[in-house]
Amino acid sequence: MVAELTEFQKKRLENIKRNNDLLKKLQLQGTANKIKREAGVDTVSRHEERLKKKKKIVNAKKQSEKEASPKTAMPTRRSRRLMGQQVKNEEGIPNVSDTQLLKMNRNKELEDLKDIKETAVIGDVKLSDLIKTEEGSNEDELLAKFKQFANKNFSSGDFFDIIKKRQKETENDSDLTKMQEDFDLHMYDVFQPNEIKITNERITSMFFHPSTDKKLIVGGDTSGTVGLWNVRDEPLAENGEDDLVEPDITKVKFFTKNVGKIECFPTDTSTLLITSYDGSIRTLGLKDLKSADIMTLRNSYEEPLGISDCQFSYDNSQVLFLTTLGGEFTQLDLRAKPTETKFWRLSDKKIGSMAINPQRPYEIATGSLDRTLRIWDVRKTVETPEWSQYEDYHSHEIVSTFDSRLSVSAVSYSPTDGTLVCNGYDDTIRLFDVNGELPEDLDEKNKTVLKHNCQSGRWTSILKARFKPDQNVFAIANMGRAIDIYNSSGQQLAHLTTATVPAVLGWHPLKNWIAGGNSSGKVFLFTDELNTSK
């Protein structure tokens, strides 16, 4: 039973009702809560507080259940790289990204090929072991191909007897017109020059075999590859039978750097001598197609010395004169077993060219990167040369010197009239009269100066003037895409145009034939024979 309200309680309820009605009329019902919010007083209701407390209790209970459940121990991940540890790869898979792994697989063959290219041929080898065709190597076929160049008719001094006879002839022919007619040469046309690629890279040396019945041109390039072109003189059939015939070219890689010089032995023209910038000296026999390793030129520290030029002595056909990329000079007797080599210093920088005076075989001329042309007497030794900054080797006596404005690229002697030609980066060709006693300043013996663009640049081999072995005529490539031929007086005899720059030249020693090699390994051949028709 509910107790009745007292008068005081009734009066209190009436006051509350009256106050609420008044607030409604004044629209101030939410003012108190608003004032609390502005004052920062918590206005959360007790109901809401109870809900929050209940939620906390439930979460705490769940957390305690999780901690009570058994947990599997997991290792903490750490970076071995940051810890400085080496990762052991037991499966042999490189620790690289997928993209890098694909690149590695793609370039593996190229890297293997590069390693092979950088590996030099050591010891005596057969060409058939180094040359592989689609059908494999065929030694009998290779021997048959070069058999005619191994004929004994071209050995035992016969070749040099012919040249000696030509050298003794007095050249009284002053008819310039006749000489120009003799060197009005025709370009070989059985194959086009862009088909005659005898090497893979830029040609650095050329050699024309002295055989007159059949032409053989040998070239070397910057990669150490030697190419032999067995020239076809017969025209191609017009009925289409020879449409698929290609130039007969054999390539073999002997060295790891530039092929510096290719020559044949004076007493046996069936054997070639080849030198390289990697210091190697090898022979190549055309009879058996075997290559013998003569030696690798090294200094006292067993470091290989790149061979820049070489020539057989006129006094002894078994002695080889050599110059190096470091400015050294030496003489090698090829009959003796390789022993410690004795060097003389002729320059503090690279010797780019060397030539022996045929009238005085004890005199040699050198053209160097130090901007000098010097003539030396190799019979006399100077212990401490004043001009050199080095004290490692003795030197020879200087006979005469010409100081050039820029480096001297080439030197070459005429066979009979005592003319020395040199050219260099000063865009000139200079002819000197070296007959008789020479003054200290070779410029006093200057015969003539020809303007010529000799600056070949990076992608073209250095242009070098070279005298023909049996005539007082020299040739030099032209940056205007031609071969220029002059006599020893500086009169121009021919201007043989080509499609590209035939930077490296090779004269035939007996015939008016000349070949030039360009920067892509291709050859331009000019002869005095009438062109054949395809």
UniProtKB/Swiss-Prot annotation:
<dbReference type="InterPro" id="IPR019775">
    <property type="entry name" value="WD40_repeat_CS"/>
</dbReference>
<dbReference type="GO" id="GO:0003677">
    <property type="term" value="F:DNA binding"/>
</dbReference>
<keyword id="KW-0853">WD repeat</keyword>
<dbReference type="InterPro" id="IPR050853">
    <property type="entry name" value="WD_repeat_DNA-damage-binding"/>
</dbReference>
<keyword id="KW-0238">DNA-binding</keyword>
<dbReference type="GO" id="GO:0034399">
    <property type="term" value="C:nuclear periphery"/>
</dbReference>
<comment type="function">
    <text>DNA-binding protein that binds to both single- and double-stranded DNA. Binds preferentially to UV-damaged DNA. May be involved in DNA-metabolic processes.</text>
</comment>
<feature type="compositionally biased region" description="Basic and acidic residues">
    <location>
        <begin position="39"/>
        <end position="51"/>
    </location>
</feature>
<feature type="repeat" description="WD 6">
    <location>
        <begin position="498"/>
        <end position="534"/>
    </location>
</feature>
<feature type="repeat" description="WD 4">
    <location>
        <begin position="403"/>
        <end position="442"/>
    </location>
</feature>
<dbReference type="InterPro" id="IPR036322">
    <property type="entry name" value="WD40_repeat_dom_sf"/>
</dbReference>
<feature type="region of interest" description="Disordered">
    <location>
        <begin position="39"/>
        <end position="80"/>
    </location>
</feature>
<dbReference type="GO" id="GO:0005737">
    <property type="term" value="C:cytoplasm"/>
</dbReference>
<feature type="repeat" description="WD 2">
    <location>
        <begin position="254"/>
        <end position="294"/>
    </location>
</feature>
<dbReference type="InterPro" id="IPR001680">
    <property type="entry name" value="WD40_rpt"/>
</dbReference>
<protein>
    <recommendedName>
        <fullName>DNA damage-binding protein CMR1</fullName>
    </recommendedName>
</protein>
<comment type="similarity">
    <text>Belongs to the WD repeat DDB2/WDR76 family.</text>
</comment>
<feature type="repeat" description="WD 1">
    <location>
        <begin position="198"/>
        <end position="239"/>
    </location>
</feature>
<dbReference type="InterPro" id="IPR015943">
    <property type="entry name" value="WD40/YVTN_repeat-like_dom_sf"/>
</dbReference>
<dbReference type="Pfam" id="PF00400">
    <property type="entry name" value="WD40"/>
</dbReference>
<dbReference type="GO" id="GO:0000785">
    <property type="term" value="C:chromatin"/>
</dbReference>
<dbReference type="GO" id="GO:0006974">
    <property type="term" value="P:DNA damage response"/>
</dbReference>
<dbReference type="GO" id="GO:2000001">
    <property type="term" value="P:regulation of DNA damage checkpoint"/>
</dbReference>
<keyword id="KW-0227">DNA damage</keyword>
<keyword id="KW-0677">Repeat</keyword>
<feature type="repeat" description="WD 3">
    <location>
        <begin position="346"/>
        <end position="386"/>
    </location>
</feature>
<feature type="repeat" description="WD 5">
    <location>
        <begin position="457"/>
        <end position="496"/>
    </location>
</feature>
